[in-house]
């Protein structure tokens, strides 16, 4: 294993721990006398004005829509590399996480509807447990450092990306009140330009990032989740150029410390502050939060593992290299960490209704996601091989 990969894995393990600490601090602040300070920090207005372009948002949205697009850019780079040359290379391996993601969206939604399908209002939240928070899931997995095989980590990344894309489509179709077709049209033109640059073998990373910035602004203005731009740019940057350079690998390596030590911990701090004020035991065990929690903790692994197992047994797909079904099940439990994406859907689903619905939705998400994180981490510790000792390379 090269020194670069060892350094990357060390960054991940440390970054995962920092992410968990940041989330814990946010939860404590949101339920203490510091709640006002915490909320004021997230509400700091940040504006960018360039000519006719004017983007004004609170700091929370800049973190979620802006900094997280950088995270998704890095994820896109890594998944593309594994699809082209790594553990997901080949159609039968590449289709495996896609089928798993489909099961991971269907089963939680159906379980939620078993609890809440009879109520016209709470039925609107059917997509809440369908989401996976890729940042938190990756952060929990990172706590295990180099015990995690590359193929298993990439399976989680690919599955979560497809899951997020599915959720973005669900939001656009069912929860978005207004979509700007003009902005989407310009975004489509930017994607076409990125594809042309890739086809022509343009190796300048800065050129892709510049067009990617335009793409991000257009998707943001369109009403669709702006982090989608990061994934698209990541897939468009060439893996290799004619002079044998790898713009993709260079950018990926450069982004890792920023993502591990700054972006993900800041994201965790900004989104984990769920207030528990005014919560009662009877409300916590009502159909809405229990449907969400059960959908995340039971529905996610049930759907992902069942669809994965069937896909392999029916010959539709193959397991990634050096991965077994015990590990797949452990990761499928970890995918029950819905957290921020689920909270976002809940805020859209119950917008304009009783505020208690949003509050108890968040509690269900917190309960299901925390349980999935603890159990998923424990299962991974059991099924993964012993920690590999680092070897110094001079």
From Swiss-Prot:
Disulfide bonds: none annotated. One of its GO terms (cellular component) is plasma membrane. InterPro entries: Na/H_antiporter_dom_sf, NhaA. Gene3D superfamilies: Na+/H+ antiporter like domain. It catalyses: Na(+)(in) + 2 H(+)(out) = Na(+)(out) + 2 H(+)(in). Keywords: Antiport, Cell inner membrane, Cell membrane, Ion transport, Membrane, Sodium, Sodium transport, Transmembrane, Transmembrane helix, Transport. It is found in: Cell inner membrane. It is a multi-pass membrane protein. One of its GO terms (biological process) is regulation of pH. The chain crosses the membrane at residues 14-34, 59-79, 95-115, 125-145, 154-174, 179-199, 213-233, 254-274, 292-312, 328-348, 363-383. Pfam families: Na_H_antiport_1. GO terms for molecular function: sodium:proton antiporter activity. Its main location: membrane. The keyword Phosphoprotein does not apply. NCBIfam families: NhaA, PRK09560.1, PRK09561.1. Na(+)/H(+) antiporter that extrudes sodium in exchange for external protons. Belongs to the NhaA Na(+)/H(+) (TC 2.A.33) antiporter family. HAMAP family: NhaA. This is Na(+)/H(+) antiporter NhaA. It comes from Yersinia pseudotuberculosis serotype O:3 (strain YPIII). The lineage of its organism: Bacteria, Pseudomonadati, Pseudomonadota, Gammaproteobacteria, Enterobacterales.
């Amino acid at each position: 294993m090269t020194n670069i990969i060892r350094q990357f894995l060390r960054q991940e393990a440390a970054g995962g721990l920092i992410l968990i600490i940041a989330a814990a601090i946010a939860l404590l602040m949101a339920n203490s006398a510091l709640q006002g300070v915490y909320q004021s920090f997230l509400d700091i207005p940040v504006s960018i004005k360039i000519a006719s372009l004017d983007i004004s948002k609170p700091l929370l949205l800049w973190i979620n829509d802006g900094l997280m697009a950088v995270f998704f850019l890095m994820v896109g780079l890594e998944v593309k590399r594994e699809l082209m040359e790594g553990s997901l290379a080949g159609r039968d391996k590449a289709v495996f996480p896609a089928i798993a993601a489909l099961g991971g969206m269907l089963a939680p939604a159906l379980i939620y509807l078993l609890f809440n399908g009879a109520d016209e209002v709470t039925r609107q939240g059917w997509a809440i447990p369908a989401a996976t928070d890729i940042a938190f899931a990756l952060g929990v997995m990172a706590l295990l450092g180099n015990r995690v095989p590359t193929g298993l980590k990439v399976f989680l990344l690919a599955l979560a990306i497809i899951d997020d894309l599915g959720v973005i489509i669900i939001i656009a179709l069912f929860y978005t009140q207004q979509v700007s077709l003009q902005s989407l049209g310009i975004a489509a033109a930017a994607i076409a330009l990125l594809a042309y640059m890739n086809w022509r073998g343009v190796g300048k990373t800065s050129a892709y990032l510049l067009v990617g910035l335009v793409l991000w602004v257009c998707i943001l203005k369109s009403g669709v989740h702006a982090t989608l731009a990061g994934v698209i740019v990541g897939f468009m940057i060439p893996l290799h150029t004619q002079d044998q350079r790898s713009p993709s690998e260079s950018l990926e390596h450069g982004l890792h410390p920023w993502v591990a030590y700054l972006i993900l911990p800041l994201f965790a701090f900004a989104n984990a502050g769920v207030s528990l004020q005014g919560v009662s035991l009877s409300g916590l065990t009502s159909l809405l939060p229990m449907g969400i929690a059960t959908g995340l903790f039971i529905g996610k692994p049930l759907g992902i593992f069942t669809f994965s197992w069937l896909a392999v047994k029916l010959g539709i797909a193959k397991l990634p290299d050096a991965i077994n079904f015990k590990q797949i099940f452990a990761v499928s439990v970890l995918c029950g960490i819905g957290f921020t994406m689920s909270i976002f859907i809940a805020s859209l689903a119950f917008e304009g209704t009783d505020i208690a619905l949003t509050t108890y939705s968040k509690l269900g998400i917190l309960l299901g996601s925390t349980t999935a994180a603890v159990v998923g981490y424990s299962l991974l510790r059991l099924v993964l091989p012993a920690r590999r000792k680092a070897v110094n390379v001079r």
